Amino acid sequence: DLGTTHAVVSWAPCEAGAEAQVFPIPQLVSLGETEERPLLPSFLYAPLPGEPPSDPFGDAPWAIGEVARRRGREVPGRVVSSAKSWLCHAAVDRTAAILPWGAADGDADLPRVSPVEACSRVLSHLRRAWDEAHPGHPLREQEVVLTVPASFDQTARLLTVQAARDAGLSARLLEEPQAAFYDAMAHLGLERFEKLLAD
């Protein structure tokens, strides 16, 4: 789930009856301290000159995850948040480096990123974390499904697919309400269901 505020990786072996598991995502939680957490905040932070390296996967010039969320509260002009929401904002060029939104134009050491690239960087962090934990089963070789809001129009969906492709993933999209329905079915033990249509 490439969420607006958090991303999560849930996975299951392809065998019948296999239980889904949440993948613990390594990330910086403070400058210089890495932890595995079930959620990766969908935040990017551009470290100030002289701050330690950005994250366990060398996402320079951006720090991604919990440290980005925390530092973003302290230095708000250097953080990108809610990048996924920008994918459906038709009034801006979603492929242009417009984020962090509202940051001072004259800040020469502040990198800029497009909404598509910001989403791709979050997905890339997830891919590299998975690949490091599962070197014999890289994520690019797995069947990847990304959930998207039902409100995403065709352009936002295509941009999500582009972000995944830019992160080295081939992904199928699934609307979030449909994903929730499938999850509820699995928890109820319903392997098969029939639809009743009524007027």
Residues of each region from the PLM?
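Gly/Thr-rich phosphate-binding beta-strand-loop-beta motif of the actin/hexokinase/Hsp70
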Residues: 1-18, 189-199
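Short acidic, glycine/serine/threonine-rich loops at helix termini
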Residues: 10-12, 156-160, 183-187
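Short, flexible loop/turn elements at secondary-structure junctions
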Residues: 4, 150-152, 178
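Charged, compositionally biased non-catalytic regions
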Residues: 5-8, 163, 177
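Flexible, glycine-rich phosphate/dinucleotide-binding loops
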Residues: 16, 153, 180
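Phosphate-binding loop and its immediate beta->loop->alpha context
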Residues: 19-167, 174
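Charged, amphipathic alpha-helical interaction segments
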Residues: 12-15, 88, 165, 169, ...
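Conserved phosphate-binding catalytic cores of ATP/NTP-utilizing and phosphoryl-transfer enzymes
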Residues: 173-199
